Amino acid sequence: MNPLIQELTQEQLRTDIPAFRPGDTVRVHAKVVEGTRERIQLFEGVVIKRRGAGISETYTVRKVSNGVGVERTFPLHTPRVAQIEVVRYGKVRRAKLYYLRALHGKAARIKEIRR
């Protein structure tokens, strides 16, 4: 890769991101712009996948809201996310948890790791 591009991407990488993996429950504080106002919107759910590397890395968070599954994909190093909190660590044996889409209720629970 071009050294100039490498240097620019290194400057934009965030260092305040906690370590989390698929299966973990996270609370994402996303900045939302509505007209001239900017506010923080919380999105809490299970990380079902992480993909990419470096500046282009993304993660997808899934939650069930009013009986409807909602998935939202965030870039990892975006300034549009104010903060990421890890609520609990889950124990899973897969990197992509797409099977959670078909499960409901207690079957969709993930075993918790105590840390």
Curated annotation (Swiss-Prot):
PANTHER family: LARGE RIBOSOMAL SUBUNIT PROTEIN BL19M, RIBOSOMAL PROTEIN L19. The keyword Ribosomal protein applies. It comes from the Bacteria. Belongs to the bacterial ribosomal protein bL19 family. Keywords: Ribonucleoprotein, Ribosomal protein. GO terms for biological process: translation. The keyword Acyltransferase does not apply. One of its GO terms (molecular function) is structural constituent of ribosome. InterPro entries: Ribosomal_bL19, Ribosomal_bL19_CS, Ribosomal_bL19_sf, Translation_prot_SH3-like_sf. HAMAP family: Ribosomal_bL19. It comes from Enterococcus faecalis (strain ATCC 700802 / V583). Pfam families: Ribosomal_L19. One of its GO terms (cellular component) is cytosolic large ribosomal subunit. This protein is located at the 30S-50S ribosomal subunit interface and may play a role in the structure and function of the aminoacyl-tRNA binding site. This is Large ribosomal subunit protein bL19.
